[in-house]
């Protein structure tokens, strides 16, 4: 069996390369596990990583081995009991079952525990928000958001095998062999010329001829011993993240805190907004976030008050939409900003106010918004607000609405709303 020895030097995190390779290879299984973990842990808990489990059958790695077919007899290293031709007895079972354990617990089947390992906080958030983006983000006059894109950045002497540059490595090999053998080849040529000259001299100088032959042989061995390629020659493609010009963006978070929103419904809304806030701050370096709470009256608040205030009251949803329109006109010129909004409510609204909300969206907000999402948190049948908003879905492609029934729906709905568009 062929054996491969990795002689490359690593830093203090000597397994970092292997870890990244493992995460890349089992990306889909890890994403599924992280998506399940979102519902188990508090979304605000981002100070720690996450334990990820992968079925044992999914982590089998490719190995180098002899091909199938043919007849081979082999004695494996470490064997001190058998010789070629011996047949090994079948192991005696420990019970009635065909499983891998002992005893009579199961009549059939076998299995292995899932492979469990921990990913770091950064890895957890990277996987959580992968393939998500703010829809329809356009470049405006003033760029403030910093997005990052991976670019080729020359070569480096360490890396993973998939990034190796064969041509550059062979160029380095040729340069090294030329540098290490040029002087020896020059001396070899001189000795060979000297040997030819001595052979043509009469009388023959046998001792000098033997000395030259010995030196020539030693030089040839030294030249042959220079390896064709060495780890010193290996060059790997280097990649780095560079900021790319992007645009200014503002996200309006509109949350219903009226009396009809019970504590469980408010908690779901807050979890959704925490997830949205983490996504924005993790993916984009500079995004303005405007928090608006509303019952019969709407008020712009800071982050702490948005998530922790206990204020409540009746329900007039249009008050929040009016306040958002005022803030846009005052602070966020449409020509310079990408405007986004995420509205969460239980759908309970004063009946005469729901048509007013639709008119505000049609005439004021949607023409100026890159994307507007409405999330209704309820297990009941939809009310007038949902039905009024439903009329907008065909007319405005930048408007989306989803229903969240329980905590388990938060992350799937979030991914649907902010899924990256495929080119």
UniProtKB/Swiss-Prot annotation:
Residues 93-102 have a biased composition (Gly residues). InterPro entries: UPF0229. Pfam families: DUF444. Residues 69-112 are annotated as: Disordered. Belongs to the UPF0229 family. This is UPF0229 protein VP0986.
């Amino acid at each position: 069996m062929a054996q491969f020895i990795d002689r490359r030097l690593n830093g203090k995190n000597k397994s970092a390369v292997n870890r990244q390779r493992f995460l890349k290879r089992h990306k889909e299984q890890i994403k599924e596990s992280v998506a399940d973990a979102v519902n188990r842990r508090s979304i605000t808990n981002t100070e720690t990583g996450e334990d990820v489990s992968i079925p044992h059958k999914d982590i089998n790695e490719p190995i180098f081995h002899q091909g199938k077919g043919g007849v081979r007899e082999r004695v494996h290293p470490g064997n001190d009991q058998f010789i070629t031709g011996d047949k090994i007895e079948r192991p005696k079972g420990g019970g009635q079952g065909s499983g891998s354990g002992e005893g009579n617990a199961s009549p059939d089947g076998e299995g292995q525990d899932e492979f469990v390992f921990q990913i770091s906080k950064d890895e957890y958030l990277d996987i959580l928000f992968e393939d998500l983006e703010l829809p329809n983000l356009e470049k405006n006059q003033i760029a403030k958001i910093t997005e990052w894109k991976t670019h080729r950045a020359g070569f480096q002497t360490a890396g993973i095998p998939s990034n190796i540059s064969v041509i550059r490595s062979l160029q380095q090999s040729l340069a090294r062999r030329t540098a290490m053998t040029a002087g020896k080849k020059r001396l070899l040529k001189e000795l060979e010329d000297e040997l030819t000259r001595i052979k043509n001299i009469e009388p023959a100088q046998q001792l000098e001829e033997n000395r030259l032959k010995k030196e020539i042989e030693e030089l040839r061995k030294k030249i042959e011993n220079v390896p064709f390629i060495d780890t010193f020659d290996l060059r790997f493609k280097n990649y780095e993240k560079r900021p790319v010009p992007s645009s200014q963006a503002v996200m309006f978070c509109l949350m219903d805190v009226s009396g009809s929103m019970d504590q469980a419904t408010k908690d779901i809304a807050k979890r959704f907004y925490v997830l949205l806030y983490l996504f924005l701050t993790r993916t984009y370096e500079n995004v303005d976030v405007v928090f608006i709470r509303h019952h019969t009256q709407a008020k712009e608040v800071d982050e702490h008050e948005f998530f922790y205030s206990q204020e409540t009251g009746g329900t007039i949803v249009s008050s929040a939409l009016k306040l958002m329109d005022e803030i846009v006109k005052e602070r966020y010129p449409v020509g310079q900003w990408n405007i986004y909004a995420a509205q969460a409510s239980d759908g309970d609204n004063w009946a005469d106010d729901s048509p007013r909300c639709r008119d505000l969206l049609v005439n004021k907000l949607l023409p100026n918004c890159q994307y507007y999402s409405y999330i209704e948190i309820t297990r009941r049948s939809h009310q007038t607000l949902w039905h009024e908003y439903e009329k907008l879905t065909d007319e405005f492609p930048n408007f989306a609405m989803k229903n969240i029934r329980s905590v388990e729906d938060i992350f799937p709905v979030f991914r649907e709303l902010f899924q990256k568009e495929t080119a």
